Amino acid sequence: MARRRKYEGLNPFVAAGLIKFSEEGELEKIKLSPKAAIAISLAIIAAILALNLLLPPP
């Protein structure tokens, strides 16, 4: 039987080579407060509900 390498401490996606992180500062993070995230979510939900009420499916 072939032995499998153990990647201890690594995320499975990183170990499989699906994600490559070459530099720590390479990825920019979006900083969003929890209140802003909830407000944006509620605004999107309200917009979708309003569109469904105003434009019902044929």
Curated annotation (Swiss-Prot):
Mostly located where? membrane
Q: Which residues lie on this side of the membrane: Extracellular?
A: 56-58
Cell compartments where the protein resides: Cell membrane
Lineage, top-rank taxon, reads Archaea
Function, in words: Involved in protein export. The function of the beta subunit is unknown, but it may be involved in stabilization of the trimeric complex.
Name of this chain's protein: Preprotein translocase subunit SecG
One GO process term, biological-process aspect: protein transport
Write the record's keywords in alphabetical order, separated by commas: Cell membrane, Membrane, Protein transport, Translocation, Transmembrane, Transmembrane helix, Transport
InterPro entries assigned? Preprot_translocase_SecG, SecG/Sec61-beta/Sbh
| Regions that span the bilayer | 34-55
Which segments sit on the Cytoplasmic face?
1-33
Nucleotidyltransferase listed as a keyword: no
What are the GO cellular component annotations? plasma membrane
One Pfam family name from the record? Answer: Sec61_beta
Q: Which family does it belong to?
A: Belongs to the SEC61-beta family.
**Membrane topology for this entry?**
Single-pass membrane protein
Specify the species. Answer: Pyrobaculum calidifontis (strain DSM 21063 / JCM 11548 / VA1)
Give the quaternary structure.
Answer: Component of the protein translocase complex. Heterotrimer consisting of alpha (SecY), beta (SecG) and gamma (SecE) subunits. Can form oligomers of the heterotrimer.
